[in-house]
């Protein structure tokens, strides 16, 4: 196989040019370099990104290129980067090339799949829209997720993005008996570490595969890690027929790493310095996240919005693909209401009577109207006080405050911190509770009884206990 060997002719940071004698590796083919740095052996994987003419290729490094020199030997693999798939990946942490990085016994995979795969064809895709029950009241009621849909999770630091992600992983594991895949794209190493140990404590680790391409890694690793995670999720969908949850944190970093590579590959930048292929790259990733006749991949993607500018090309390219948005609000978190989901800002494509039914739609819009009216009355209350409101408005305010409190919920994964047992609330129970509040059935119950409980039954029990004590 001497023909498949080449040599380095140029190193430009994470981009390496390689020349072969008589062989030309295909685009996306993996190349291996084994070399020594300061007495330690290193194995580096490159991925072919462009043909430069002759038998020269330009490749992207999946790890640091320190220690590479010209004329060093490179070996073509004859195939793409392949990563382990199957149940053995659960509970483990992987890097972009599928090596386990959790200091446990190295995984000897029985099955590997290439990370670049075709999106499901039109014939394979499932067209029926089905709601995906999360067991989280505020999401199921006001911004429901669809099976195989894509959800954007917007929120600043410390408002509870990670906790919602962990709760979703927990609920999928225990209520739907499903698996989750978490791809940390350009994540802080500390956050990835915290997530691993929190999942271990929360008891959900054996139902999730973790793939990390951290902030300190070269752009190739940060970009391709999304495909590594997605490939693992696709196996569970296509071969096991499961409904999988795929988390990407953060999708903005995927676009950002593509921009870093694009300039080095010699492409002329487009708007705001992003790569000219931004929309195509985003589409390539997002189109693989789909429902097929076998199973589905529902994805929750954390979206960082640079300088809070929603028109920035990177977040704008994500919006086109989203079916629902879950917006976390710091003001709600400050009130002590968790999950801190903004009930008026969060949206869903399936929140329509045709998709979720007349009853659910009426209750959801009714709740939003009451909350919006309460928001509009805030200024009057601040200036004149509650007593100056009409009887009708007073009732609205009372109900809105109960709704706000009832949208909070104790989480299973937060039991360690809160001390109160987690609650999974079915859609039926959620609709029954909020429908009753709108009808005025619970006007006589104090608002504190609605705080941090599951179903409306618990509200009644809590109110009874409060009365007795």
UniProtKB/Swiss-Prot annotation:
Catalytic activity: ATP + H2O + 4 H(+)(in) = ADP + phosphate + 5 H(+)(out)
EC number: 7.1.2.2
Keywords annotated in UniProt: ATP synthesis, ATP-binding, Cell inner membrane, Cell membrane, CF(1), Hydrogen ion transport, Ion transport, Membrane, Nucleotide-binding, Translocase, Transport
Organism superkingdom: Bacteria
Pfam families recorded: ATP-synt_ab, ATP-synt_ab_N, ATP-synt_VA_C
GO CC list: plasma membrane; proton-transporting ATP synthase complex
Principal location: membrane
Binding site residues for ATP: 155-162
Subcellular location per the Swiss-Prot or TrEMBL entry: Cell inner membrane
Gene3D superfamilies: 2.40.10.170, Bovine Mitochondrial F1-atpase, Atp Synthase Beta Chain, Chain D, domain 3 (1.10.1140.10), P-loop containing nucleotide triphosphate hydrolases (3.40.50.300)
Repeat as UniProt keyword: no
Membrane-topology annotation of the record: Peripheral membrane protein
Phosphoprotein is among the record's keywords: no
UniProt xrefs under PROSITE patterns: ATPASE_ALPHA_BETA (PS00152)
SMART domains: AAA (SM00382)
One example GO MF annotation: proton-transporting ATP synthase activity, rotational mechanism
The protein's role, per its UniProt record: Produces ATP from ADP in the presence of a proton gradient across the membrane. The catalytic sites are hosted primarily by the beta subunits.
Assigned protein family: Belongs to the ATPase alpha/beta chains family.
Complex formation: F-type ATPases have 2 components, CF(1) - the catalytic core - and CF(0) - the membrane proton channel. CF(1) has five subunits: alpha(3), beta(3), gamma(1), delta(1), epsilon(1). CF(0) has three main subunits: a(1), b(2) and c(9-12). The alpha and beta chains form an alternating ring which encloses part of the gamma chain. CF(1) is attached to CF(0) by a central stalk formed by the gamma and epsilon chains, while a peripheral stalk is formed by the delta and b chains.
Protein name, entry field: ATP synthase subunit beta
Organism: Helicobacter pylori (strain J99 / ATCC 700824) (Campylobacter pylori J99)
Source organism phylogeny: Bacteria, Pseudomonadati, Campylobacterota, Epsilonproteobacteria, Campylobacterales
Gene (UniProt): atpD
């Amino acid at each position: 196989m001497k023909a498949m060997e080449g040599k380095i002719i140029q190193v430009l940071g994470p981009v390496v040019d390689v020349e072969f004698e008589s062989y030309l590796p295909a685009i996306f083919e993996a190349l291996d370099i084994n070399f020594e740095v300061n007495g330690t052996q290193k194995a580096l994987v490159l991925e072919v990104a462009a043909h430069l003419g002759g038998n020269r290729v330009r490749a992207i490094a999946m790890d640091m290129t320190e220690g590479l020199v010209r004329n060093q030997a490179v070996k073509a693999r004859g195939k793409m980067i392949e990563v382990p798939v199957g149940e053995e990946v659960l509970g483990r942490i992987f890097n972009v090339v599928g090596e386990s990085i959790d200091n446990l016994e190295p995984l000897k995979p029985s099955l590997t799949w290439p990370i670049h795969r075709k999106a499901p064809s039109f014939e394979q895709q499932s067209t029926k829209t089905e709601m995906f029950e999360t067991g989280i009241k505020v999401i199921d009621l006001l911004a429901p997720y669809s099976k195989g849909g894509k959800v954007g999770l917007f929120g600043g630091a410390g408002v509870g993005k990670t906790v919602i992600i962990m709760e979703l992983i927990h609920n999928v594991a225990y209520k739907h008996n499903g698996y989750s895949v978490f791809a940390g794209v350009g994540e802080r190493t500390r956050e990835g570490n915290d997530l691993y140990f929190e999942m271990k404590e929360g008891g959900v680790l054996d139902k999730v595969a973790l793939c990390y391409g951290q902030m300190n890694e070269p752009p190739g690793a940060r970009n391709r890690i999304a495909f590594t995670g997605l490939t693992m999720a696709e196996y569970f969908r296509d071969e096991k027929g499961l409904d999988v949850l795929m988390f990407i944190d953060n999708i903005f970093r995927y676009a950002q790493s593509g921009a870093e590579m694009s300039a080095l590959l010699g492409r002329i930048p487009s708007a705001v310095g992003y790569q000219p292929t931004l929309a195509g790259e985003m589409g390539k990733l997002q189109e693989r996240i789909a429902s097929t006749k076998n199973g589905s991949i529902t994805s929750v993607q954390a979206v960082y919005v640079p300088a809070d500018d929603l028109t920035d090309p990177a977040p704008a390219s994500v919006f086109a693909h989203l079916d629902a948005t879950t917006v976390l609000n710091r003001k709600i978190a400050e009130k002590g209401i968790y999950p801190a989901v903004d009930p008026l800002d969060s949206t869903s494509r399936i929140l329509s009577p045709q998709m979720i039914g007349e009853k659910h739609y009426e209750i959801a819009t009714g709740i939003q109207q009451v909350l919006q009216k309460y928001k509009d009355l805030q200024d009057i209350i601040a200036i004149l006080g509650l007593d100056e409101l009409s009887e009708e408005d007073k009732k609205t305010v009372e109900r809105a405050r109960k709704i706000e409190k009832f949208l909070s919920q104790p989480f299973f994964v937060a039991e360690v911190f809160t001390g109160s047992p987690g609650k999974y609330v079915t859609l039926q129970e959620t609709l029954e509770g909020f429908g009753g509040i709108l009808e005025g059935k619970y006007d006589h119950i104090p608002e504190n009884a609605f705080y941090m409980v599951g179903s409306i039954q618990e509200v009644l029990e809590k109110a009874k206990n409060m009365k007795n004590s």
